[in-house]
Amino acid sequence: MNQFKVISKFNPTGDQPKAIKSIAKGIEKREKFQTLIGVTGSGKTFTMANIIEKVQKPTLVLAHNKTLAAQLCSEFREFFPNNAVEYFVSYYDYYQPEAYVAQSDTYIEKDASINDEIDKLRHSATSALFERKDVIIVASVSCIYGLGNPEEYKKLTISLREGMEKDRDEIIKKLVEIQYERNDIDFSRGTFRVKGDVLDIFPASSSSKAVRVEFFGDEIDRIKEFDVLTGETITKLKHISIFPASHFATSKDRLEVAIKDIEEELEERVKELVSQDKILEAQRLKQRTNFDIEMMREVGYCTGIENYSRVLDGRAKGTPPQTLLDYFPQDFLLFIDESHVTLPQVKAMQAGDKSRKDSLVEYGFRLPCAYDNRPLTFKEFENKLNQVVFVSATPAKYELEYSTNTAEQVIRPTGLLDPEIIVKPVKGQIDDLYTSIQETIKRGFRILVTTLTKKMAEDLTDYLKEMGVKTRYLHSDIDTIERMKIIHDLRKGEFHVLVGINLLREGLDIPEVALVTILDADKEGFLRSETSLIQTVGRAARNSESKVIMYGDVITKSMEKTIKETNRRRKIQMEYNEEYGIVPKTIIKDIREVIQISDIAEERKEYDNLNEALKSYNNDIDKLIEKYEEEMKEAAQNLQFEKAAHLRDVIYKLKKDKETEL
């Protein structure tokens, strides 16, 4: 069995060894909840990697968005090149859920664009859990959504061995049952092809490698893995497991039982609707459900089959759905990254889903069993947990209340200190701010200014521009790409001051920033809470010459706690630096890290100028669509989701224009 092994030229330093030892010991002692408090730049991911190596448990790392999950996955792959590090997020590039708006009698059909590459990665993640123990899966909150029964998934797996007596046609039938399609021409993921005694299978978890099974009569003579593009043999295999092409694949026996249950529920619900004098709704439900049943009987699945997942799984009404958490063995470990943001997200998921389903069930679009195709409630999520480590610079009440052990990671290996905090009165704050900005610009650094309202942010931006200061305003209407472009320009020095409201917290690490100012710091509220203030102060923690100015006439409890905590961390780091002779030094990351993303914003302009693009293709709209489709697939393969989604929208527009012309 493969062991987790961290590969790195660095060894744990500062607070890392102590934190690793403390958390690992807690895991060995069966502590259920622990917290790792780690400041910005202290190497929390490296600590997590070393904990995984120590405890040797299959691990799930939960992040609060796709981008952060991709970043963490990339870092873990660097630390664990010889282990399975997988990525599991929502596979929708675009998703419009099914809904019904009663006021306008509008039914909105489910519309989705599935990213084939992410679907492959999801299959790779689940199959890895059945094949090995050394698995790390980095996931978004998508992992608390229904995924199909892991027992059924495992039961439907086709196991093939060299020398095994197996009828070729029987294997083909089983492949169809687990939702593989026969395609002798377009051989792609989730398909198989047959030529004489040779059966080629393209696994759902692969993008470039397929499996060739050669028969001699009814015996499997040879199994080999080959490159789909070149046809060259990669390796000879003694055994291969073919996992289902869909997580919702169901055996024929189970499907027949499920169909009977669906028919019974339909009969009951139709009677109920008729008794309420809802004849139209009853007729609609009967028609839609019978069509789905017919599809299931014919091809084994139907559009929206997930709405019947509770019946297909044989679960009782109201019981929690099976999720990625159920695919893990019982002794798995869970890290919840940025837990102060991620946990509230998990808590909010189920309520929104139920309110949408209410009208679908009430007006006869769905059976009541659709309610159980949902994310986990927070209580259900808690019940599925084994051992959890919350990771945050500012853990919330829940984490601190439930944790029986807390490890702190304050010391940064770089020696950088938390910034000095200065409190100044509100009166004359704009004049003082202007003076502080000029001083910081002279030293060659940048400035972040956080305000309480949109109006104030806009007015302040206009004022600073009038005073000759190069200023930009980062507001909530700006999309991810444009936001990254603005940050890129700030780092390059295209402008010097960035003004924002609630946008200067997690994930905005700019080493060139030497001044962070917080206007109206004494106005208590969620934007000026202790958590919010500590996160905002952390934005200045990448520069050795940085400071934070809080403008307020009184020192609130949140301000007091933030100042006290920052000073405590400064003291610890200063003592460490003195002991080991470390001189704090700003580490300026290569600006190219952001250029890759900001380049997409430039590409958008190119894609949006369709008239120019068509001219360069002699007005051949089909050729242009073909080019953009290739670029979209390439972008998705490189996990450039924003670019892929934008290209999809451009292609859709071109196809619409083409239809109009016809």
Swiss-Prot record:
Residues that hold ATP according to the record: G38, V39, T40, G41, S42, G43, K44, T45
Pfam families (alphabetical): Helicase_C, ResIII, UVR, UvrB, UvrB_inter
Family annotation (Gene3D superfamilies): P-loop containing nucleotide triphosphate hydrolases, UVR domain
SMART domains tied to this protein: DEXDc, HELICc
Motif Beta-hairpin positions after renumbering to this chain: 91-114
Sequence ranges assigned to domain Helicase C-terminal in this UniProt record: 429-595
Main localization of the protein described in the UniProt heading: cytoplasm
UVR domain boundaries: 622-657
Any GO molecular function: ATP hydrolysis activity
Domain of life: Bacteria
Cell compartment(s), UniProt: Cytoplasm
Keywords recorded for this protein, A-Z: ATP-binding, Cytoplasm, DNA damage, DNA excision, DNA repair, Excision nuclease, Helicase, Hydrolase, Nucleotide-binding, SOS response
Entry-linked InterPro entries: Helicase/UvrB_N (IPR006935), Helicase_ATP-bd (IPR014001), Helicase_C-like (IPR001650), P-loop_NTPase (IPR027417), UVR_dom (IPR001943), UVR_dom_sf (IPR036876), UvrB (IPR004807), UvrB_inter (IPR041471)
Keyword check for Cytoplasm: yes
Gene Ontology terms: biological process: nucleotide-excision repair; SOS response
Statement: the UniProt record of this protein carries the keyword Cytoplasm: yes
Residue stretches making up the Helicase ATP-binding domain: 25-182
GO cellular component: a single term: excinuclease repair complex
UniProt domain comment: The beta-hairpin motif is involved in DNA binding.
General function of this protein: The UvrABC repair system catalyzes the recognition and processing of DNA lesions. A damage recognition complex composed of 2 UvrA and 2 UvrB subunits scans DNA for abnormalities. Upon binding of the UvrA(2)B(2) complex to a putative damaged site, the DNA wraps around one UvrB monomer. DNA wrap is dependent on ATP binding by UvrB and probably causes local melting of the DNA helix, facilitating insertion of UvrB beta-hairpin between the DNA strands. Then UvrB probes one DNA strand for the presence of a lesion.
Family, similarity comment: Belongs to the UvrB family.
Subunit field text: Forms a heterotetramer with UvrA during the search for lesions. Interacts with UvrC in an incision complex.
Name of the protein in question: UvrABC system protein B
Organism: Clostridium botulinum (strain Kyoto / Type A2)
Classification lineage: Bacteria, Bacillati, Bacillota, Clostridia, Eubacteriales
